Amino acid sequence: MKPLELDVFLCRTDNFGVLVHDPETGFTAAIDAPEEAPILEAATRRGWKITHIFTTHHHTDHVTANLALKEQFGCEIIGPINEAVAIPGLDRAMADGDSFLFGDHTVNVIETPGHTAGHICYHFVDDKLLFAADTLFALGCGRLFERPAADMWHSLQKLAVLPDETAVYFGHEYTLSNARFALTVDPDNERLKSRAAEIEALRADGKFTIPTTLGLEKETNPFLRAADPAIRRNLVMEGKTNEEVFAEIRKRKDHF
């Protein structure tokens, strides 16, 4: 089985567009459809025909180009069953634990409510790829629009059990702000400090910070580290639950 090929580019202001291409079948999936023109440019540049859209959630900046791409390519749109009525052009609705094949590549669906009520992530099992959209960012997580903090904490735990080497592709280039915030709640984390310096340099050069890895996030992302004693001491929350610590971190980030 040939490895998948990926193309990553910016859409809108800070959305990531991602195309996933299977060279054996010619299938090409857009991970969400934030904006038509950059997606078409990337597909044309690579000589790929878009056959699928894997929608993660219903927010406008992730589904804007669904219908235009479907009209042009006749692509199949897959998306979350619990947001089915809000996904333009949806063909197949997926629930937590569902799986399907993209060529010979197995894709598992992980429902991660928090940012939205029915948000899903796509895990390419053998390829060790996770498309986490607005659930898990590099050094961050999505804002809580439709579900409480406890739900998002448990959603993140569902991702955290995947292999550490899993490459994580996320929905927005928020990493620099996330790094600066992370240092306020985990200031003595040496790995975080070195990573923040790397991110500052990357962004100064106009380079992307995508992908990250799950292992790196577990070492440095405060939203995955609510159980960490140092973070709890810094927040003066030693006796609180993981959900309460996570909620406090999310609240602080909202006002950062």
From Swiss-Prot:
Keyword field contains Kinase: no
A molecular-function term among this protein's GO annotations: hydroxyacylglutathione hydrolase activity
Positions annotated to bind Zn(2+) 1: 57, 59, 115, 134
Alphabetical list of CDD domains matching this protein: hydroxyacylglutathione_hydrolase_MBL-fold
Annotated catalysed reactions: an S-(2-hydroxyacyl)glutathione + H2O = a 2-hydroxy carboxylate + glutathione + H(+)
Top EC category: hydrolase
SMART domains cross-referenced by the UniProt entry: Lactamase_B (SM00849)
Family: Belongs to the metallo-beta-lactamase superfamily. Glyoxalase II family.
Name under which the protein is recorded: Hydroxyacylglutathione hydrolase
Organism for this UniProt entry: Rhizobium johnstonii (strain DSM 114642 / LMG 32736 / 3841) (Rhizobium leguminosarum bv. viciae)
Gene from which this protein is expressed: gloB
